[in-house]
Amino acid sequence: MLSPKRTKYRKYHRGRMRGKATRGNEVSFGKYGLQALEPSWITSRQIEATRRTITRYTKRGASLWIRIFPDKTVTARAAESRMGSGKGAVDYWVATVKPGTILFEISAVPEEVARAAFNLAAYKLPIKTKFIIRKDI
């Protein structure tokens, strides 16, 4: 599972996701990309499950880039605990994703294989996604 080695703060505010992604919204490493169409938090477990699905389908013949990183903590209280006494313990890590963010990139495989791999990978994610092809400059 992905998580930062160290952070400035242990616990974060939830914040809110407004607008579209202005950075990380173009395919820059691979030839094909998986783009988010909705705002959401994507957990490190979901990222790992998606990565495994893509690598298994491509039989490890593809180069894969994970363009998001879970750098925000989500806290949870113990079950049946009373209110008060501070914020709960860190439960898991999430990546904040806005619409337009490129989640994964892939290269060194045919377009049909990449499309099928990303289609399978999309089932592991809690958001709608879109397959995109790199625009050559």
UniProtKB/Swiss-Prot annotation:
Species this protein is from: Thalassiosira pseudonana
GO CC field: chloroplast; mitochondrial large ribosomal subunit
NCBIfam families reported in the protein's UniProt record: rplP_bact
Gene Ontology biological process terms from the UniProt entry: mitochondrial translation
Protein's name according to its UniProt entry: Large ribosomal subunit protein uL16c
Quaternary structure and interacting proteins, as annotated: Part of the 50S ribosomal subunit.
InterPro entries hit by this protein: Ribosomal_uL16, Ribosomal_uL16_bact-type, Ribosomal_uL16_CS, Ribosomal_uL16_dom, Ribosomal_uL16_sf
Pfam families per UniProt: Ribosomal_L16
Protein family per UniProt: Belongs to the universal ribosomal protein uL16 family.
Repeat is among the record's keywords: no
